[in-house]
């Protein structure tokens, strides 16, 4: 579960390394976000000489959480870190590569471009 002030790793090569969640999109008083939710975040750490810079406000979709994800078939998935992929206003990823495994639920939420870039889909 991701809430405001939560730090996340960036799972793509967009230029950001670490994000801090400042808003969860959806409802006006939504407290937690899970895999597949879109958040508004600020870049806390960035790679030098890249298009994204520190303290820039961006949108991102959550691809991994430490909190368990229960599937309908009884399977439980848990990751070692909280990670997100930076997206633009249309929902397309800003980077050209995605690092690490991502959940299959992103395909059902119409993030097919992120799923196609991922090396492993669980």
UniProtKB/Swiss-Prot annotation:
Please give the biological process terms from Gene Ontology that the record holds.
Answer: translation
Which Pfam families does the record associate with it?
A: Ribosomal_L14
Q: Where are the transmembrane segments?
A: none
Principal location listed in the UniProt entry: plastid
Q: Which GO terms describe its molecular function?
A: large ribosomal subunit rRNA binding; structural constituent of ribosome
Question: Which CDD domains does this UniProt record tie to the protein?
Answer: Ribosomal_uL14 (cd00337)
| SS bond partners | none
Subcellular location(s) per record: Plastid, Chloroplast
Assigned GO CC terms? chloroplast; cytosolic large ribosomal subunit
Is the keyword rRNA processing in the record?
no
User: What PROSITE patterns has UniProt attached to this entry?
Assistant: RIBOSOMAL_L14
Enumerate the UniProt keywords alphabetically.
Answer: Chloroplast, Plastid, Ribonucleoprotein, Ribosomal protein, RNA-binding, rRNA-binding
Family recorded in the similarity comment: Belongs to the universal ribosomal protein uL14 family.
Q: What does this protein do?
A: Binds to 23S rRNA.
PANTHER family, per this entry? 50S/60S RIBOSOMAL PROTEIN L14/L23, LARGE RIBOSOMAL SUBUNIT PROTEIN UL14M
Share what the entry says about its subunit structure, partners included: Part of the 50S ribosomal subunit.
The protein depicted here goes by the name Large ribosomal subunit protein uL14c
Q: Which organism is it from?
A: Piper cenocladum (Ant piper)
